[in-house]
Amino acid sequence: MLRHTLRATALFILAIAAVWVAPSYGISKEFDQQYPLAPGGSFELQNVNGTVAVQGWDRDVVEVHAVKIAKHRESDLERVSIEVDAKPTAVSVATHYPPDEGVEVSVEYTIHVPHNARIEHIGTVNGSLRIASVDNVEELHAVNGNIEVFDGGGPLHAHTTNGNVQMEVAHMRDKDGVTAETTNGSVILALPSDTQADLETRCMNGSFSSELPVRMESTLRPREMHGKLGRGGAPIHLRTINGGIRVVILRSTV
């Protein structure tokens, strides 16, 4: 687990470096707050325009660091608000835009949560999601952007329309499952070599491959496959329209 965590942290640092390269035209304003969260507490975040990066850590605290970036007018920064509802067992963050159009502001989030927090939902419309070293991740949703999970646990449901889905699931209980869906993009799922799961894949315009042995059970429709990893167990659903699907072995690194 430590090796996976170190790798996830390194990848997260690289991701954050990419997040903080703001456009040269950007007029920005920062937001920094911390909120206590009880062990096993929940966290959710809804964004509109901008990347969200979440990293697990050893503190029972949620740290929210955000940068609002306006394309044209500094006054637009005040028209986009970051609202937080913080309770001892649940923290919720949301980006709110004014009802009228014409406000070109993005919000880039960097979040730290306890490793054992429950990620209830994280979503954005235009931007990517990156999650690392969180044991319980539930719902991830993007429209135009990639979804990446490193050293994560389920039950995990990730959906994007225009983007790739890449997930490293280091631990998955029998009652958990994984669902990864995209319309225009590829799906890559990394699992431990001893994973026991029921696997269902569907890729309309692309190929499927697996480094783990798959015992084929049926192909109910063209481009759809049902099989088992090991003895079978937790349900895994992988779907894409325009792209390929790969199941690979999760490899430890130092």
Protein language model annotation of sequence segments:
Residues M1-V254:
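Intrinsically disordered, low-complexity terminal regions
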